Amino acid sequence: MQTYSTPLTLVIVTSLFLFTTQGSSSNAVEPTKKPLKLANYRATCEDRTRTLVTRLNTSHHSVVWQRYDIYSRYMRRMPPLCIITDAYKETTRQGGAAFACTRQNLTLYNLTVKDTGVYLLQDQYTGDVEAFYLIIHPRSFCRALETRRCFYPGPGRVVVTDSQEADRAIISDLKRQWSGLSLHCAWVSGMMIFVGALVICFLRSQRIGEQDAEHLRTDLDTEPLLLTVDGDLQ
């Protein structure tokens, strides 16, 4: 009897756990969908190639990669970069960077400042959406920044855009980037000034030492000669 007590206890505990889990899951309320956020993707400017990777589960779903221009006063939606379904794959060329797309990522090549914008991936099956800020500076930095309260997966698989919030978020990101760049430039300038001051102090001390040596030689050359009683020079 003692041999079967432990397995029987495990069965009872497991059954109670499953029953409790099912009851709690059936009564759980689906949380309200919040704006999607994405961790920062940092990259350097050397090769001008960026890959935007989605966290959405878009396998075997129809997806659309889209770009929003943020150089104009308001965000302007451009034609879809890439549409992928089970039946076909369609890409467009907008005169910007060359690109390659899949259901999970979008790789952009030979980026320029004109390619700055918001790149958005929408899952046509679930309606989920994920957006990337891609801020490109000619020489200083090239980064894909996290999204703010801009794009929502709305009802009917439609992307809902809060234009005012999006504008504020983009302006905030740009200010943050420029402030970071300004601090970096200020730090570099401060280091250059510090190093320059050290070099000037070193050269000045070296020059003062040379002048002291020259004065000493001059004093020795101009010191008067004295005759002793024996006729020796002093």
From Swiss-Prot:
It is found in: Membrane. Keywords: Glycoprotein, Immunoglobulin domain, Membrane, Signal, Transmembrane, Transmembrane helix. Residues 1-23 form the signal peptide. Residues 24-182 are extracellular. One of its GO terms (cellular component) is membrane. Its main location: membrane. Glycans are attached at N57, N105, N110. Belongs to the RL11 family. This is Viral Fc-gamma receptor-like protein IR11. It comes from Human cytomegalovirus (strain AD169). The lineage of its organism: Viruses, Duplodnaviria, Heunggongvirae, Peploviricota, Herviviricetes.
